[in-house]
Amino acid sequence: MKLRISIAGPAAQEDALLAKITASAESLKQLLGEDAYAEELKPLEELIGELLVARGETLSTAESCTGGGIAARITSVAGSSAYFQGGIVAYANGIKQAQLSVNPADLLVHGAVSEPVVKQMAVGVRKHLKTDWAIATSGIAGPSGGSEAKPVGTVWIAVSGPG
């Protein structure tokens, strides 16, 4: 969600208007707490990079339905090599098992597009690539392949991090 605050008034009252905007922004920050991640308009991948650099932390990705799209966006940011270690595109279940340590039983019971599997993908890539953080995705992109239980458009996303 993006929120833009604007207040209009005479130019002679510019200082008073700026004070109102600042007070409104501060109230919103208190209300949103840690759910607010930026006060300026920047792409999410750039903000993630700035945060990782500031913390001295690293990131990896494990992608199925996004096919490397997240990694592409992360690496589109200048300087991303300082924090992005790499990614694994694991479309096939065998790759999920071999490269990401996904439990074959969970694939059989829950399927590749499921909470337990995507969590294991995130943990697996974080451990395999030795990063602080990992993002994993698995889903049914369509146009076919969906079911009543898992329709086209179903996506699971997991983040694995320290602690």
Which ranges hold each PLM region?
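Terminal amphipathic helices with adjacent charged low-complexity linkers/tails
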Residues: 1-23
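Short alpha-helical segments enriched in small residues
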Residues: 15-163
